[in-house]
């Protein structure tokens, strides 16, 4: 029984969820993000979900948490594209989310 509880506790830690927190200072961030104007300019198309259980792996479904310690990734929104690690575009529908440039996928693991 003890081992089952340990395994059940560790399984959520190994999933690649996309709970993000928008940080105030760039030096505290894991990833610097720039929001582009057009979909064809982005590396990742992001859909903001309403609940944390709606995130599904590294597929561009982001849930913005209220506290830094709840997040999987801390992101900082930059003012210029050349300052960013990742360029994103917010989409209107869940099925539109996903990676356009898979070479940047490692940034969100």
Regions found by a protein language model. Name each.
Residues 1-15:
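Sec-dependent N-terminal signal peptides
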Residues 18-109:
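Repetitive, compositionally biased segments used for assembly/scaffolding
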């Amino acid at each position: 029984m003890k081992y089952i509880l340990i395994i059940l506790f560790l399984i959520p830690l190994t999933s690649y969820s996309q709970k993000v927190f928008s940080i105030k200072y760039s030096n505290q961030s894991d990833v610097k993000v720039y929001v582009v104007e057009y979909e064809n300019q982005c590396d990742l198309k992001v859909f903001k979900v309403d609940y944390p259980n709606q995130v599904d792996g590294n597929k561009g479904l982001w849930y913005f948490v209220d506290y830094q310690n709840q997040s999987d990734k801390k992101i900082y929104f930059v003012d210029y594209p050349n300052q960013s690690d990742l360029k994103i575009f917010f989409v209107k529908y869940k099925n539109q989310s996903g990676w356009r440039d898979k070479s940047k996928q490692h940034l969100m693991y």
